[in-house]
Curated annotation (Swiss-Prot):
<dbReference type="GO" id="GO:0008360">
    <property type="term" value="P:regulation of cell shape"/>
</dbReference>
<feature type="active site" description="Proton donor/acceptor">
    <location>
        <position position="187"/>
    </location>
</feature>
<comment type="function">
    <text>Provides the (R)-glutamate required for cell wall biosynthesis.</text>
</comment>
<keyword id="KW-0961">Cell wall biogenesis/degradation</keyword>
<dbReference type="InterPro" id="IPR004391">
    <property type="entry name" value="Glu_race"/>
</dbReference>
<keyword id="KW-0133">Cell shape</keyword>
<comment type="similarity">
    <text>Belongs to the aspartate/glutamate racemases family.</text>
</comment>
<dbReference type="InterPro" id="IPR001920">
    <property type="entry name" value="Asp/Glu_race"/>
</dbReference>
<dbReference type="InterPro" id="IPR018187">
    <property type="entry name" value="Asp/Glu_racemase_AS_1"/>
</dbReference>
<keyword id="KW-0413">Isomerase</keyword>
<dbReference type="GO" id="GO:0008881">
    <property type="term" value="F:glutamate racemase activity"/>
</dbReference>
<feature type="binding site">
    <location>
        <begin position="77"/>
        <end position="78"/>
    </location>
    <ligand>
        <name>substrate</name>
    </ligand>
</feature>
<dbReference type="InterPro" id="IPR015942">
    <property type="entry name" value="Asp/Glu/hydantoin_racemase"/>
</dbReference>
<keyword id="KW-0573">Peptidoglycan synthesis</keyword>
<feature type="binding site">
    <location>
        <begin position="13"/>
        <end position="14"/>
    </location>
    <ligand>
        <name>substrate</name>
    </ligand>
</feature>
<feature type="binding site">
    <location>
        <begin position="45"/>
        <end position="46"/>
    </location>
    <ligand>
        <name>substrate</name>
    </ligand>
</feature>
<dbReference type="InterPro" id="IPR033134">
    <property type="entry name" value="Asp/Glu_racemase_AS_2"/>
</dbReference>
Length: 272
C-alpha cells in the first residue's frame, strides 16, 4: 500500500451515463473512495468536434486530479474516442482507463454473424470504434447505428416515456430486421435503458456493456501499482459533482437508484 491509496478513483462523463461505470467499479472495489464528475453544463458530448472534446476532457481530468484522483476513468465512449491518447500525454503520472465498445466479445458470441452497435454520432465518427471493428470483427457484419436524442432523454430521467421508446424502437428495429442477434452499447448512458431495450429486442438478443471490463481493468491497475485502499469492512465514500444543477442531479441519481453519498457543485474552465 502506498500513501496514495486513500486518494479517490476519479471518473467523468457528460452526465449520468458514467454512473453505470461507477456502479461496476463500486461492485468490484467497495472499499475505494470514488469521485465522479458529471459535466452536465456541456451535455451531450455526442455532437461536439474532436477539438472541443479534447479540451473538455482535459478540463474534467484536471478537475479530478486537482482533487486527488489517483486514477481517472474516462467513463464516456465519445470522450474516450476523441481524447484518451491526449489525456495520457497531458497527465503522464496518472493512469487513465477509457471506454472501448465490446465489439470483440460481440464478434465471438454472435450466432447470426450480425452485430449492431448503438453509439453517439461522435463515437461513430472517431477512429477507435473502427479500429476495434477492423481488428476483432473480421467476417462479422457490424452495423453502426447513431442514436441522437437518447442521451438527452436519459438525462431527463424519461426512460419509459413514449418519446424515448419511439427513439429506441427506431434505432433498434433496423438492426433486428438486418439479422443482428447481438447489440453493443457504445455509450455509457445506454445501459440505463437495458430493460426498455430488452422489451424491444427480446430475451434472445445478447446486449453487451463495456462497464464490467472497464471496472476489471481499474481493479487490475490499482492492484499492480500498489494503489489499493487498505480497508477491511468500511465502504469507500462516493462523491458526485456536477457542472449543472446539483439538486436536479441528486434527484436523478436517486430516481435511477445509482450509488452516491453526496452531490456537489463543480466549476470547470475550458481552455480555448
Amino acid at each position: 500500500m502506498s500513501d496514495q491509496s486513500a486518494r479517490p478513483i476519479g471518473l467523468f462523463d457528460s452526465g449520468i451515463g458514467g454512473m453505470t461505470v461507477l456502479r461496476e467499479v463500486r461492485r468490484l472495489l467497495p472499499g475505494e473512495n470514488l469521485l465522479y464528475l458529471a459535466d452536465q453544463a456541456r451535455c451531450p458530448y455526442g455532437s461536439r468536434s474532436p477539438d472541443e472534446l479534447r479540451a473538455i476532457a482535459a478540463a474534467c481530468a484536471a478537475w479530478l486530479i486537482a482533487r486527488g484522483a489517483k486514477l481517472v476513468v474516462v467513463a464516456c465512449n465519445t470522450a474516450s474516442a476523441a481524447a484518451l491518447a491526449d489525456l495520457r500525454r497531458r497527465f503522464p503520472a496518472i493512469p487513465f482507463v477509457g471506454m472501448v465498445p465490446p465489439v470483440k466479445p460481440a464478434a465471438s458470441r454472435t450466432r447470426s454473424g450480425v452485430v449492431g452497435v448503438l453509439a453517439t454520432p461522435a463515437t461513430l465518427a472517431g477512429d477507435l470504434l473502427h479500429d476495434v471493428i477492423s481488428r476483432w470483427a473480421e467476417g462479422v457484419h457490424v452495423i453502426e447505428q447513431a442514436c441522437p436524442g437518447l442521451v438527452e432523454q436519459i438525462e431527463e430521467g424519461a426512460l419509459d416515456s413514449p418519446e424515448t421508446m419511439a427513439l429506441l424502437r427506431g434505432y433498434v428495429t433496423p438492426l433486428l430486421d438486418a439479422g443482428a442477434d447481438t447489440i453493443v452499447l457504445g455509450c455509457t448512458h445506454y445501459p440505463l435503458l437495458v430493460p426498455q431495450l430488452r422489451a424491444i429486442a427480446g430475451d434472445d438478443t445478447l446486449i453487451l456493456d463495456a462497464a464490467p471490463a472497464v471496472a476489471q481493468r481499474v481493479a487490475q491497475i490499482v492492484q499492480e501499482r500498489g494503489l489499493m485502499r487498505n480497508v477491511n469492512t468500511l465502504s469507500g465514500a462516493i462523491t458526485c459533482a456536477t457542472t449543472g444543477d446539483p439538486e436536479r442531479f441528486a434527484n436523478l441519481i436517486h430516481r435511477l437508484d445509482l450509488p452516491c453519498d453526496r452531490v456537489e457543485q463543480a466549476v470547470i474552465t475550458i481552455d480555448a
